[in-house]
């Protein structure tokens, strides 16, 4: 049984340290909201409020860093213990059992020389002739389970993908047309590196739609 690092991380965060991960998520959310509020506050006009928010942001940032370090260290220790347990369960115990029952057949093949020299391989290492040994049987079962697990991952685990939008055509005042291609990644402006003007968005949201359309038409014509 093979478990990837991402699967182990999901298992550890959601089950083993669920309370700590929930606390970390709430702290990150509070930090994001406080930082947004601080960016909306003018440091010159409302310095006392801005300074208070700044201290709150610094405090939350330090708490988030400490919580991340705590989770990372505990995850490292737990991963070593978990991998040791899985090694004993998947490798050490089957090896001991196969060695102890190496002469005991799992079942016998149909009588006859159907398999030829393969019959000796089925009885490896010390099972009676014409039988399937425990070593071969556990190896085949483990391989089948591994293949089923890989097919299940490919079937149920889907990768994220980018959605391409159709080309947009913009008309100029001279009558010429300009075609541009836009790729939508569904990411916020902070992740794409674009400058986000919150005050502009608030002002535009408060104005009627007709005025907004007229202003956008004037900008496109310019």
Swiss-Prot record:
Topology Cytoplasmic: residue spans: 1-86, 149-222
Basic and acidic residues biased stretches: 194-206
One cellular component term from this protein's GO annotations in UniProt: GET complex
Highest taxon in the source lineage: Eukaryota
Spans traversing the lipid bilayer: 87-107, 132-148
Cellular compartments annotated: Endoplasmic reticulum membrane
Membrane topology: Multi-pass membrane protein
Gene Ontology MF terms in the entry: protein-membrane adaptor activity
Keywords, comma-separated and alphabetical: Coiled coil, Endoplasmic reticulum, Membrane, Transmembrane, Transmembrane helix, Transport
Lumenal side: 108-131
Record-linked InterPro entries: Get1 (IPR028945), Helix_hairpin_bin_sf (IPR029012)
Pfam family, one: CHD5
GO BP annotations listed: tail-anchored membrane protein insertion into ER membrane
Coiled-coil annotated residue ranges, if any: 48-75
Compositionally biased region (Basic residues): 213-222
S-adenosyl-L-methionine recorded as keyword: no
Residue segments, region Disordered: 168-222
Record family assignment: Belongs to the WRB/GET1 family.
Function: Required for the post-translational delivery of tail-anchored (TA) proteins to the endoplasmic reticulum. Acts as a membrane receptor for soluble GET3, which recognizes and selectively binds the transmembrane domain of TA proteins in the cytosol.
Family annotation (PANTHER family): GUIDED ENTRY OF TAIL-ANCHORED PROTEINS FACTOR 1, TAIL-ANCHORED PROTEIN INSERTION RECEPTOR WRB
Summary of subunit composition and partner proteins: Interacts with GET3.
Stated name of the protein: Protein GET1
Name of the gene this protein is made from: GET1
């Amino acid at each position: 049984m093979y478990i990837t690092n991402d699967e182990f991380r999901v298992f550890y965060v959601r089950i083993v340290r669920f309370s700590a991960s929930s606390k970390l998520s709430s702290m990150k959310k509070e930090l994001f909201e406080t930082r947004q509020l601080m960016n909306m506050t003018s440091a010159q006009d409302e310095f006392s409020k801005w300074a208070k928010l700044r201290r709150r942001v610094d405090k939350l940032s330090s708490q988030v860093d400490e919580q991340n370090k705590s989770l990372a260290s505990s995850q490292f220790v737990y991963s070593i213990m978990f991998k040791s347990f899985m090694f004993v369960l998947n490798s050490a115990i089957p090896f001991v059992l196969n060695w102890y029952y190496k002469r005991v057949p799992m079942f016998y093949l149909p009588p006859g020389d159907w398999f030829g020299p393969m019959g000796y391989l089925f009885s490896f290492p010390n099972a009676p002739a014409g039988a399937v040994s425990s070593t071969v049987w556990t190896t085949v079962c483990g391989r089948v389970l591994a293949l089923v697990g890989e097919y299940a991952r490919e079937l149920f685990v889907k990768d994220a993908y980018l959605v391409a939008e159709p080309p947009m055509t913009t008309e100029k005042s001279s009558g010429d047309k300009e075609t541009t291609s836009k790729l939508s990644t569904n990411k916020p402006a902070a992740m794409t590196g674009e400058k986000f003007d919150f005050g502009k968005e608030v002002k535009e949201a408060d104005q009627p739609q007709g005025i907004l359309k007229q202003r956008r038409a004037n900008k496109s014509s310019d």
